[in-house]
Design a protein with these regions (language model features):
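Glycine-rich phosphate-binding loops of nucleotide-dependent enzymes
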Residues: 2-235
Length: 235
């Protein structure tokens, strides 16, 4: 089976800083694939590059068999690839419902069944649908960012640090929701500093250090890796 997303030997720069150095990985349909590593390892830069916010100096990025390496973000979204960015980035002065509707912008309409689906996954958002998004808690804003991404029925969802800044209880809830999305057939590329949580729900993972992939394997294999335990799991 051909990979849904295929990243091959990409090199990405911030000015003269070589942030991503020859990274290659694949995401197959129905998988959760995680990128783990310390701050500054290049994880978020890779997501920005895949979503078109940055462009690689060299290398290829294929999504559903099409080259998207130098495509603009608005074009990439129409292909079925959405990015839930680090820091949630909700429209603070718009209502919860208006934020959710924005997720369907590329469809040109707001499908009622999609609204019902996200409210069934995130009942707390339904209760707060008329509330300004900026007044939600951090966990609720993360749920809203995820709900907004789901509105366009994407083929691949990329999530950048979904547990950042959340309480342990909310972290559990967010990872439970991500696992449920995978069970319902979603394909997810996850960037997460909480390696323990990420590896427990992921099918495959890649470890990044200073812009390079240094390890890869199944979630279980990396959880049991002594190198990963020492570096990321407190072992």
């Amino acid at each position: 089976m051909a990979a849904m997303l295929k990243v091959h030997d990409i090199h990405v720069y911030y000015g003269k800083i070589h942030a991503v150095k020859g990274v290659s990985f694949e995401v197959n349909e129905g998988e959760i694939v995680s990128l783990i590593g310390a701050n500054g390892a290049g994880k978020s830069t890779i997501l920005k590059t895949v979503s078109g916010l940055m462009h690689p100096k060299s290398g290829t990025i294929e999504f559903m068999g099409k080259d998207i390496a130098h495509m603009e973000p608005n074009k990439i979204v129409t292909k079925g690839l959405v990015h839930v960015p680090e820091g949630r980035r909700v429209f603070a002065h718009m209502s919860v419902m208006e934020n959710i509707e924005m997720g369907a912008y590329i469809l040109g309409r707001v499908p009622e069944e999609a609204v019902e689906d996200v409210f069934s996954r995130f009942p707390r958002l339904k209760e707060r649908s008329r509330q300004e998004a900026g007044t939600l808690s951090g966990g609720e804003q993360q749920m809203l960012a995820m709900a907004r991404a789901l509105m366009s029925k994407p083929k691949l969802i990329m999530m950048d640090e979904p547990s950042m800044g959340l309480s342990p209880i909310l972290v559990e809830q967010i990872f439970s929701i991500i696992a449920e999305l995978r069970q319902s057939g979603a394909t997810i590329l996850l960037v997460e500093q909480n390696a323990n949580k990420a590896l427990k729900i992921t099918d495959r993972a890649y470890v990044l250090e200073t812009g390079r992939i240094t390890l890869s394997g199944s979630g279980r294999e990396l959880l049991e890796s002594e190198d990963v335990k020492k570096a990321y799991l407190g072992g």
